[in-house]
C-alpha cells in the first residue's frame, strides 16, 4: 500500500480531487496544511466543513488551538504515526495540502533540532530590542545560506534559525 500526495495552492481543487479519489479507493485523508491544523481557522484556508467531507475520515484537522504554536517536527511525528497505523490496517492514505515543508517532513528524512523555549525567548527579546536588520545580519554572519533563504522581515524564522545555530553549533 502506498501514500498518495496531492499538493498545491489554496483553493485549487485539491480537496475535491482527494475526496473523489478517497471514495473510489476507500482511503483516509491526512491534512498537510499548516493553517488547517488550527481550530477556527476556516476562512482563508479553504478547510472543508465536517458536512463537506462525505463521511471520509480526515486526520490532523482542528488539532491545535489558535494560541498554540505549530511545530513541523511534531507534525512529522503525528502524521507519520497516523500514516503507519492506516497502512498497517491496509487503508490507502491520501496526504492533501499546500504546506511544502509539511509534505517533505512526511516523505523525506528530515531531522529537526530540538527547541529550547528559554533560549528562543532570549533571542526573540534581542530581536525586539535590536530589530530585524541586526538579527538578520547576525544570522548572515553565522549561516549565510539560511540568511539567504529567510527574509529579514520574518523575524520568527530568523529567531528560530539563530536558536538552531546556538543549539547545534
What are these regions (language model features)?
Residues 1-169:
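Phosphate/pyrophosphate-binding catalytic cores of soluble transferases and nucleic-acid-acting enzymes
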Amino acid at each position: 500500500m502506498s501514500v498518495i500526495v496531492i499538493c498545491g495552492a489554496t483553493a485549487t481543487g485539491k480537496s475535491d480531487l482527494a475526496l473523489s479519489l478517497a471514495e473510489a479507493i476507500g482511503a483516509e485523508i491526512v491534512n498537510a496544511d499548516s493553517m488547517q491544523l488550527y481550530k477556527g481557522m476556516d476562512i482563508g484556508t479553504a478547510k472543508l466543513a465536517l458536512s463537506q467531507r462525505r463521511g471520509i475520515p480526515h486526520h490532523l484537522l482542528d488539532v491545535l488551538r489558535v494560541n498554540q504554536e505549530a511545530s513541523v517536527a511534531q507534525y512529522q511525528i503525528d502524521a507519520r504515526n497516523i500514516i503507519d497505523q492506516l497502512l498497517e490496517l491496509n487503508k490507502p492514505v491520501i496526504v492533501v495540502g499546500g504546506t511544502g515543508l509539511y509534505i517533505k517532513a512526511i516523505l523525506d528524512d528530515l531531522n529537526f533540532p530540538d527547541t529550547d523555549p528559554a533560549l528562543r525567548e532570549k533571542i526573540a527579546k534581542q530581536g525586539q530590542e535590536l530589530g530585524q536588520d541586526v538579527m538578520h545580519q547576525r544570522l548572515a554572519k553565522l549561516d549565510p545560506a539560511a540568511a539567504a533563504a529567510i527574509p529579514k522581515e520574518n523575524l520568527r524564522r530568523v529567531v528560530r534559525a539563530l536558536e538552531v545555530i546556538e543549539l547545534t553549533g
